[in-house]
Amino acid sequence: LSDYSIGEGFGEVIEAEILSNSALCNKNMKDIDLPKGIRIGSIFRNGKIIIPTSSTVFNENDDVVFFSESKCIKKLEELLSIKQSYE
């Protein structure tokens, strides 16, 4: 996870890896309810840059660049968090 402050601290650019048990893994862009204030800029997968569309699916190990308003960082952290599985 890397992040960079932009716009005099009003926003951040965050690069994060999609883990196998992340809430985003194997999800289609159109099925993700991104909060207002968070946008996906690009995905780095298998040595290629992908500009996501509504049909893009997040894969394990994708490196994703997010743009977020500072006030939305907590919501983004929740999206990137690990899903708990109970048996």
What does each model-identified segment do?
Residues 14-82, 87:
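Cytosolic Rossmann-like ligand/nucleotide-binding regulatory domains
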Residues 1-15, 86-87:
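Long, charged amphipathic helices and adjacent flexible linkers at domain junctions
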